[in-house]
């Protein structure tokens, strides 16, 4: 590893260690200087706001209007270009934002998993989408709403001083950098093991005006921002169907935007859509579906992937679970966490998906493994209003939002959603060194044919991209 990269890794690990000690069970950690306004930017803001004219606005096109399709390849190329231009400070800022997203999402996940534990399906959470959505709302927020959003993002607003305020543009740019660092890996060799696309949908009532600087700022995080208008007042189910048809038409993704529970007088739905596709090197799709045991007496037939290689692995005899690290690239990996007994899934989830859970990665060691696991195609949506309430964080996404930087209209937020389309598939090219058939030691047969947990993690960026629970691969909740 080059010296500069090693220095960055050491700095990040020191920040993580310090933050873990300082944070304890609290959500909030120290506001790192890389993500807040400095004195020079505060002076520029003061000058810009002095005698500043009203921000230009526009009315989103009707959702029925013809739209150009989203070019996912172009989105990936743009992320790769972003990653190539990052300097050392940019990478450290990206790591800092990734760490903040990890802390927030572990807290949300640990509280919300109590609800998920009662559901026999598959659930998935995107730390980057959660953090990115809240940061996007912060970009459009003013006064008490901005204050409370900043606190939830992990950077308390100490006083009225500008230099303690989160810089939304820095945060959103850092989130795009985190995405770019993931998809840029292995591109030099012409390989594309990972695809990650983020699209923001801004759905408004007819006649509502959005401010152009806000929408332009969102492009720092998600290059594809789709503002559209439609009627929410007559039938929310019909409105949800229109949104879903529109998104499938422009992206090709079959995802849902559930509006159940939203008020009929809502005039804004904010949805962050994420598509992830990971190709597992040296794995192949088995010819026939295999049994997956949902519980001791119930099984379902699911497509399975199979691969053999030398993977990082650890089995905890005391708490009775195992962890296997399957590489996507040199830095990015899939972490598979399986209880020794299916009935212990909730217990193992509580042990592993928490703020200091990545400490057990130091215990992993090479092991020859023949791994069989479900081919995952997961689609799920969740409402951040529900997640924040479950996590006992301030309920700030309701009717009292101050979003003056987003619109001059009185915004009534119906839903703040994240919709995830997650795919794991086989990459049946020639096996790489880590996935070639092992020689020598006895091969461990590892079959994930009962409930398990997973995470997508980048070791260099110390960023978690997805946290998931699979109790039944055929059902997403």
UniProtKB/Swiss-Prot annotation:
Gene3D superfamilies: Alpha-1-antitrypsin, domain 1, Antithrombin, subunit I, domain 2. In response to low blood pressure, the enzyme renin/REN cleaves angiotensinogen to produce angiotensin-1. Angiotensin-1 is a substrate of ACE (angiotensin converting enzyme) that removes a dipeptide to yield the physiologically active peptide angiotensin-2. Angiotensin-1 and angiotensin-2 can be further processed to generate angiotensin-3, angiotensin-4. Angiotensin 1-9 is cleaved from angiotensin-1 by ACE2 and can be further processed by ACE to produce angiotensin 1-7, angiotensin 1-5 and angiotensin 1-4. The disulfide bond is labile. Angiotensinogen is present in the circulation in a near 40:60 ratio with the oxidized disulfide-bonded form, which preferentially interacts with receptor-bound renin. InterPro entries: Angiotensinogen, Angiotensinogen_serpin_dom, Serpin_CS, Serpin_dom, Serpin_fam, Serpin_sf, Serpin_sf_1, Serpin_sf_2. Glycans are attached at residues 38, 143, 161, 296. The keyword Chloroplast does not apply. It is found in: Secreted. SMART domains: SERPIN. Belongs to the serpin family. This is Angiotensinogen. The gene is AGT.
